[in-house]
């Protein structure tokens, strides 16, 4: 009996270890000495996966702002840091910081959309372009977009998500209400032949397209990420502020402006006490690979934000609704 049990463990152990190793857990330690990576966005560029993510000031320096880290992978699991993008390197040295990247591959180049950071209500969406995915040149017209102040927005724009739908580009962004208390989603549009510069974008709706409603969404909807299935757009979004806990929801639309939640409950919850993501599962990015498979990248931690890791899970679809492969 003992010999049979030993043989069984010997056979299964390599597969168990392989399964454990296949769980992506990425944390960039270059800035503050501990894993600290947020706001992931992934593209397939020239056959290699590139992940862009937010990194904090070096050693929490008060004179240096947030930046964007760059990592590459061939399997979406194992990632190597290959560089970083800063306000100085991109050509916007007057900005206090930059973070929350969104990347788009067009005609052999990577277009990076990111937010200025550190200016409160004046934070806005910016744009830069790269030929190699690592070295970027900023748009001379930066910032390219922020909404005008109105009864629903203070004029701030962060967490850009840019996508093309029905011949137009949609720029999804998070903004605060005039009291700077509630975070909610807005959207701007541009023509299909846009160069993404300032002046190209028009706010598409004079109210939030998605605002917090359910208890789990708290006072915040942010971090929108878009994918397509059939004639529908799906938005994966973060509900509630960081570590409240933040969790992930899904909404659906046929026009990119009017959205309906798929459920009153989170699609991806924070982990149970003791698990790596017990403080949150947040700021999603839904990556669609060239073969059509979809993966949910998101950030998490279990120490109220002292560290931040990025992971991913494959998303499967049935009857127009997504579900996690790990939970099937």
What is each of the regions a protein language model found here?
Residues 283-284, 298:
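C-terminal transmembrane module of eukaryotic multi-pass membrane proteins
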Residues 20-96, 104-155, 163-219, 227-277, ...:
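Beta-rich carbohydrate-recognition and catalytic domains
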Residues 1-21:
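Bacterial Sec-dependent N-terminal signal peptides
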Residues 100:
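Peripheral membrane lipid-binding modules
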